[in-house]
Amino acid sequence: DIVLTQSPASLAVSLGQRATISCRASZSVNWYGNSFMZWYZZKPGZPPKLLIYRASNLZSGIPARFSGSGSRTBFTLTIBPVZABDVATYFCZZSBZAPWTFGSGTKLEIKR
């Protein structure tokens, strides 16, 4: 199985600043020119929400403050600028090789 190493485990960012979350795969998740990496946002009591698919594509309805980048094994989720509503846990997920696997999550908090 592909192992995803996500960092940092937690992150405190001031409102209006940039949050950067990294995800490294144990092997390439590229296939036919696509990077099969997704990013999700999860809030307590709510199902995970897809933010980014295939590494850099913004899901419909997701604000452009969210962006994804990377290829092969190294990927980044950026939130810029961070808003109060972004407090959540963020997960990367690979959809290249079954069983699909998730990173361990990054908890985003607002720095006061």
Swiss-Prot record:
Q: What is this protein called?
A: Ig kappa chain V-III region TEPC 124
Q: Per the record, which residues fall in region Framework-2?
A: 39-53
Q: What PANTHER family does the entry give?
A: IMMUNOGLOBULIN LIGHT CHAIN
- Region annotated Complementarity-determining-1, chain positions: 24-38
- Record region (Complementarity-determining-2): 54-60
Q: Where is this region: Framework-1?
A: 1-23
Record InterPro entries = Ig-like_dom, Ig-like_dom_sf, Ig-like_fold, Ig_sub, Ig_V-set, IgV_Light_Chain
Entry-linked SUPFAM superfamilies: Immunoglobulin
Its lineage reads:
Eukaryota, Metazoa, Chordata, Craniata, Vertebrata
From what organism does this protein derive?
A: Mus musculus
Entry keywords, A to Z: Adaptive immunity, Disulfide bond, Immunity, Immunoglobulin
Entry keyword tRNA-binding = no
